[in-house]
Amino acid sequence: MMNQMGMHMQQPGVVPGGPGGPVGMAGGPVGGVGVSPVMMQSPQMQQQQQVAAQQQQQQQQQQQAQAHQQQSQQTEKVDNISKVKGLVGPLRDSLSTTVKTAAQLLQQNNLNDAGTKGGDMSTTTPRFDKHLEEFYSICDQIELNLKTAKLCMQQGASSQQYLPIPVAPTQPNPAETNALSYSQYLDVVKIQIGYAKDIHDTLICAAQNICPSE
């Protein structure tokens, strides 16, 4: 009996543990298999990794959206009206330079006619014709862009009048089911051109029949 009681007595500083064996005072398993704290934290680590991956995907999507917006803005700036707006500044500078050059040449010619020296002869005479040609070149570019914009507006109005069905771009939106594709639009234009040619030929034949040539 004394031996059995001694076997059941607890050792000092040791408390009985579970299936893994006795547990010490610090709470760690003694002589048994415990659960690693890394394994206990693995679900939290997985959640953090998933959140980080989602944030990276969102950042990539935002960057792609910003790049798409920049490309669309660059393509929008290519139209004729934007070109005209961009040429207004160079036109103003060219006009100012041309007027200043003309004033310098007039002053120099006045001094030459009066028989006085026009300052330092080593300085080069400003080229009035060059500045004037540059000014007219910018004016021609503005005029050409304005004419092109006017023709585009006229063609757009004619298209809305004679072909009210909207034309889809090269990459059509799936939601726009009542839109023509670009290839269908080209076919319609070819048919209209053929009709116009037939009417033209018919009118010419009728005019020749009314007034036959001798």
From Swiss-Prot:
Name of this chain's protein: Mediator of RNA polymerase II transcription subunit 29
Complex and partners: Component of the Mediator complex.
Record keyword Transcription present: yes
Family from the record: Belongs to the Mediator complex subunit 29 family.
Residue spans of biased composition, Low complexity class: 44-74
BP GO terms, sorted: regulation of transcription by RNA polymerase II
Annotated organism of origin: Aedes aegypti (Yellowfever mosquito)
Entry keyword set: Activator, Nucleus, Transcription, Transcription regulation
GO terms under cellular component: mediator complex
GO molecular function: transcription coregulator activity
Region (Disordered): 1-78
Residue ranges with Gly residues bias: 15-34
Principal subcellular localization: nucleus
Described function: Component of the Mediator complex, a coactivator involved in the regulated transcription of nearly all RNA polymerase II-dependent genes. Mediator functions as a bridge to convey information from gene-specific regulatory proteins to the basal RNA polymerase II transcription machinery. Mediator is recruited to promoters by direct interactions with regulatory proteins and serves as a scaffold for the assembly of a functional preinitiation complex with RNA polymerase II and the general transcription factors.
InterPro entries recorded: Mediator_Med29_met
